[in-house]
Amino acid sequence: MTPFWVLKTEKAPASAVLTEDTLILENRYIRRVIDRKTGLTVSLTDGDGTEAIARSIREGAVSVDGTGYILENPSEILIREGSLTEKKFEYIPKPYNTHPYPYPAPGKAAEITYLRDALEIRVLYEIFDNMPVLRKSLYVTNHSDHTVTINTAETEALCLNDTGKLQLYLETDYTGNNGSGFQWNTSLFRDEDIMSARFDMGPDYDLQAGGTFRGMQVYEMFCQSTCFEHRMNEVQNMYRRVAPWVCEAPLFLHLISDDSKELRDSADMLADIGYDMIIQSFGSGIDLENEDPAYIERVKNDYDYVHSKGLTIGGYTLAIIRDYRPMNHDCATNGDHNQISRCLCTKWSADYWNRVVSFLAKTGSDFIEIDGPYHFYTCTGNKPGQAEHLHKGLADSRYSQWLKSTVEVTAKMKELGIYINAPDWLYLSGTNKCGVGYEEIAFSQPRLTQILMNRIYNYMGTYHKIPSMGWSFLPVEEYHGGGAAAKFEPLTENLAEYDWVLAEAAASGVWPCVRGKRLYDSELCRQVVKYWTDVIRRHKKLLNSNTVHVYPPKPLKELQTAEDIDVILQENNTTRDKLFLMVCNQTERTITKQLLLPAFYTGLTTLERPHTAPKSGSFDDVTIPGFGSWPPVYPENMENLLEEAVPAEDSGVHMALFEHDLPEKRTEAVIDTNGNLLLTVTMPPMSYTYYVGYAAEDMPEDPIPVPEGKPFGCRLIREETLPETEIKNAVSDICQIPRFCVGVYVT
């Protein structure tokens, strides 16, 4: 059996070979065989020879000026010399990239060319080193002397058998769905046994003489696991390698000011604490469309100061229409979306992007936060008084907006080295981050509710996202209302809650938009913020690795407490620190519980592949409270075909767990023959703690001291619900007093 590739460190180089009869693309984990005469795929297997396709059908299809062309019987097949996989832009990893894989991902490539009339149709097949992943791309060049219309374009078509339906994962770069990943019937279509990658409408694209049409790219991975949890970790590890910019994990402040003094003061504060980035967010006043030389010079001077502190910086721009920036006569409208969005394929939008990119270059920006585009928006075309559209009408509007305002604009920004926050799932085009999956109005709820909701959002959102692919929220200043009960200012007064929300952000790896003008307001508060910054920096790679989902947060009706203990669990097999575990008891009672924690991704188990699923209830039983009309959307769980985890015999492998990563707080835990770690914890009410795990013979070096007076999260006891003696006992069970309890000292 082939080892589980996510943990495998040995090389699995790819090859592309032409034999007399076939083109073979393969590595240790995946193999695709194409018949040279017909150009059809005749076999698609995993590293153990398991077949995914039932029969050959077609390699794809295009329709041009109403004439359909099936991709078969090629004119030419070429192997690209060397390790030449395609790159979409130049990319150099930033210092805060936790997994700086080379880009483009190394591998082999082959081109198959079909000549049809005056059209040259090229299909590029790429197979990557060290992973069970292929990529397939479609290009059409018009060699005629007149414009032709690409009516439809299908990059891939596979007839799958039962194994293929279950284990072949496909994703395209033509995706979106408001940040929740791909959805069926937009770029991927399943018709009984046939899996097709094609545009859901159009593209109806006018291709000028001598021009080349770029179809969607399809990523195809032969998954080794049939458990949803393990399969999603395979998808995340594919992303780390084919789009390594998603592993950039800066610590940032969502600054809501464009005042030079406040910006520079924030830079001093962030440099002191050890953050990476300032984001001048919406509401800050930054204007990325401003072409006034004096304004650009002022911004550049401020940004130069920020850079001198070792920080990166950038700002927010609005690419769509919101209530606070209504449509003007020069802003074309998506005719079928009730004027909520500009069309981003107009003369206006082309000028807009040029202004923004020019601003980024002139000011030395490192970052941009773009409100838009949202994928799958369409536009009905020109209307009186609107800007000139650069597309014809409805049928070509979706593809044209994607090409002009996602593919092309993103590439320009990446060439400048820009980190991109975007509101949709555009990672394969070059964006770094979008929302982890949350409802904005949740952050106008009381702080205890926010603490609980953040854990729910981060738990659910990290199934399909690497932690660094998502952001959450931490409203230092008021956001979407809620008043004093919702914001974390004054920070020292609310330090118990502020500490907890920073702790769970650190443990989850999902950094929130810390929205305000400062990180601390006292030396005591500074020490707490600095502590969590140091913890993140110490364990940064581990905290952006394999999130293991077990014991989810389950809120009670009032949304300020949970039913039971919940955990956040991160694992990595290549680092000294193998495991990071945060245990939360946001209940009003003391709980003793034996935890059964899957430890496969630590690399310390005796298993070649994971053969049990996480404990029952780690996905579908999670209730996600809603606060308004825009609840978060997460990918659908797949049927689990592995047995659920249960305690088993001692495997003989033990792990050393250090509470707070302190050598004097060592616990030795057993890993059983199912690869699960057994740990018994006793947690006071409204408390949390964390452990860092190492191989049994290892231990932390240069421990980070816990600052004097740190709340350690466990002081959020609501005094009206517990007797005074129980409050004092709960506090003194874990740490030295005095400690915070809802903003006041408990003595």
What positions do the PLM features span?
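Acidic-aromatic substrate-binding/catalytic surfaces of carbohydrate-active enzymes
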Residues: T2-L7, E20-H99, G107-A109
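Short acidic, Pro/Gly- and aromatic-enriched capping/linker segments at domain boundaries
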Residues: W5-L23, F189-Q208, N676-L677
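Active-site-proximal substrate-binding groove within the catalytic cores of carbohydrate-active enzymes
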Residues: E26-R28, G39, L44, S405-E664, ...
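Conserved structural scaffold segments of CAZyme catalytic domains across common CAZy folds
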Residues: E72-D330, G335, A350, V510-C513, ...
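Trp/Gly-enriched beta-strand surface patches
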Residues: N161-T212, G617-V670
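Non-catalytic positions within long, well-ordered alpha-helices that form the structural scaffold/packing
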Residues: A271-D272, L360-A361, A506
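Aromatic- and carboxylate-enriched substrate-binding clefts and catalytic-loop regions
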Residues: S281-G481
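C-terminal beta-strand-rich structural cap/linker in extracellular carbohydrate-active enzymes
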Residues: V670-V746
